[in-house]
């Protein structure tokens, strides 16, 4: 592939070391797919402005993937997946980037180094260079980059998403996907023969006999249970206690029974892709990743025991008939740590934002996060902050749904968008629905920041409403606090479909 040429080493060269990287690639169920060995450059030895400049490279949002999977179920689309072999070796180094690498062990020639022509694995600029290469090739075969997601590509008959070198295709006719994949190969892209989309980035896409789709990560859950040593342990039926998880600085030290950071990393990936029901519990445990205590070990193991009891389940995509039906459920827990954490700890007075946005009654985006940007001074203020955060995600999502529905050619009965924001706080409802805003001395200082939100409500008033919801029906509640078993299972059923 002309990745390099051997040149004589000179004194002015910044020669970076090389290394071998060995990786096990797994199927979504955890079984080994193949062993990989890559000759890599030591990117940590590069010097910015000398042998690399820009490094940013986007990847597809999982919100986009879930939206496409909902459309697949609704419209009976065909889907295929492909993988670009030796992806980074497709793209050239940009002009002015002179990168020199040691020759690999066993092939060294005294006084000589490798002058790279292609973006070798390990270089800081490699992901960006390949992304730019892929965009160019996609455009050349009629797949145009979306303005709402830089890794979503829309054509006349095919839609594709890309996460580095992993690509998912959708079309009404499977033949169109094969033709588009062939066109990419003819452009020099080494795209492996596409297969049925049974999994993507470690998430199993299981299509049931009744036409429903379930996103699950049983293989990852098994690895978490094994890492925690819970194979023979009893199970739990909720992922978190009813009381918040505190810092416990003076408590018993962490007993080092497992790698806390590693397990938290796996749990975060799981919570962000197929298990929103554990998002609150995982976010709380992740706060103490760098200074865990014994109490945090027990909290993480509780999550593991809950996952053990529900390991075979994930998000069930059971879409309603209208993909343009969007529901947002923002919620907040005002100063939820107060009285549980030490009063001298600034985080004890922080509130928590939690929300989920459903498209066609299926969850596509969710958040459980501490309100670190500011400290709410009342329940209404905490709710407004949560509503504001939710709307920052909702409005672009509405535009993306409109774009995708146009691209796939929705039938006429499905072309009317209806968006509803479900709010359970009366004060937040009044502030959200009032324009021009009726400021009070207590609300002015933070309400000004949200005027854009109310202006958007006015612009979209024909399709968007903000309405009252009973607290017991508020889906956002599952993202803000630990709930009793009955309440948790009721909301989980509404959220996850089981």
Model-inferred region functions:
Residues 25, 88-103, 121-125, 155-189, ...:
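Catalytic palm subdomain of template-directed nucleic-acid polymerases
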Residues 141-148, 168-221, 225-228, 304, ...:
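Polymerase palm active-site segment centered on the conserved acidic dipeptide of motif C
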Residues 10, 22-26, 154-156, 207, ...:
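Short, low-complexity Ser/Thr-rich regulatory SLiMs
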Residues 81-88, 115-123, 147-171, 196-206, ...:
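Catalytic palm active-site di-aspartate
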Residues 29-31, 48-50, 89-92, 99, ...:
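Short helix/loop capping segments that flank catalytic or ligand/cofactor-binding pockets
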Residues 1-136, 140-147, 227-229, 256, ...:
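Chromodomain-type histone methyl-lysine reader module
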Residues 56, 65, 158-159, 212, ...:
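Divalent metal-binding acidic/histidine catalytic loops
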Residues 11, 25-27, 44-46, 85-87, ...:
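Conserved beta-strand elements of beta-rich interaction domains across eukaryotes
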């Amino acid at each position: 592939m002309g990745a390099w040429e051997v040149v004589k080493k000179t004194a002015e060269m910044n020669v970076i070391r090389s290394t071998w990287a060995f990786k096990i690639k797994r199927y979504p169920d955890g079984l080994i797919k193949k062993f990989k060995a890559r000759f890599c450059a030591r990117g940590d030895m590069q010097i910015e402005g000398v042998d690399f400049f820009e490094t940013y490279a986007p990847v597809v949002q999982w919100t986009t993937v879930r939206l496409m999977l909902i459309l697949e179920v609704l419209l009976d689309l065909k889907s295929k997946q492909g993988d670009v072999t030796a992806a980074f070796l497709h793209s050239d180094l940009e002009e002015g980037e002179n990168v020199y690498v040691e020759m690999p062990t066993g092939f060294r020639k005294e006084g000589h180094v490798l002058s790279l022509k292609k973006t070798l694995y390990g270089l800081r600029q490699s992901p960006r260079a390949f992304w730019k290469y892929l965009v160019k090739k996609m455009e050349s075969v009629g797949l145009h980059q979306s303005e709402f997601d830089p890794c979503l590509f829309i054509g006349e008959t095919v839609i594709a998403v890309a996460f580095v070198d992993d690509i998912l295709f959708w079309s009404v006719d499977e033949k169109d996907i094969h033709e588009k994949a062939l066109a990419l190969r003819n452009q020099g892209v080494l795209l492996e023969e596409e297969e049925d989309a049974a999994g993507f980035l470690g998430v199993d896409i299981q299509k049931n006999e009744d036409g429903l789709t379930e996103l699950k990560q049983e293989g990852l859950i098994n690895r978490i249970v094994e890492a925690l040593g819970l194979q023979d342990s009893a199970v739990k039926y909720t992922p978190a206690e009813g009381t918040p998880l505190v810092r416990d600085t003076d408590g018993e030290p962490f007993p080092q029974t497992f790698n806390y950071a590693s397990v938290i990393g796996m749990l975060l990936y799981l919570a962000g892709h197929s298990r929103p029901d554990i998002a609150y519990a995982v976010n709380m445990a992740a706060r103490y990743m760098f200074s865990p205590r014994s109490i945090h070990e027990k909290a993480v193991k509780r999550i593991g025991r809950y996952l053990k009891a529900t390991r075979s389940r994930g998000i069930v995509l059971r879409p309603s008939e209208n993909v343009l039906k969007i529901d947002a459920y923002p919620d907040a827990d005002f100063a939820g740590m107060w009285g549980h954490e030490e009063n001298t700890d600034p985080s004890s007075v922080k509130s928590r934002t939690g929300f989920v946005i459903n498209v066609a009654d299926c969850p596509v985006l969710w958040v459980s996060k501490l309100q670190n940007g500011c400290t709410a001074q009342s329940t209404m203020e905490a709710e407004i902050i949560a509503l504001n955060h939710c709307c920052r995600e909702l409005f672009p999502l509405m535009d993306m749904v409109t774009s995708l529905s146009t691209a796939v050619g929705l039938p006429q009965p499905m072309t009317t968008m209806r968006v509803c924001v479900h709010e359970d706080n009366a004060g937040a409802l009044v502030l959200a629905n009032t324009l021009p805003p009726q400021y009070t001395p207590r609300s002015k200082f933070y309400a000004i920041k949200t005027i854009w939100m109310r202006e958007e409500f006015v612009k979209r008033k024909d399709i968007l409403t903000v309405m009252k919801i009973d607290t017991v029906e508020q889906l956002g509640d599952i993202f803000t606090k630990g709930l009793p078993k009955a309440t948790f299972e009721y909301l989980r059923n509404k959220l996850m479909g089981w």
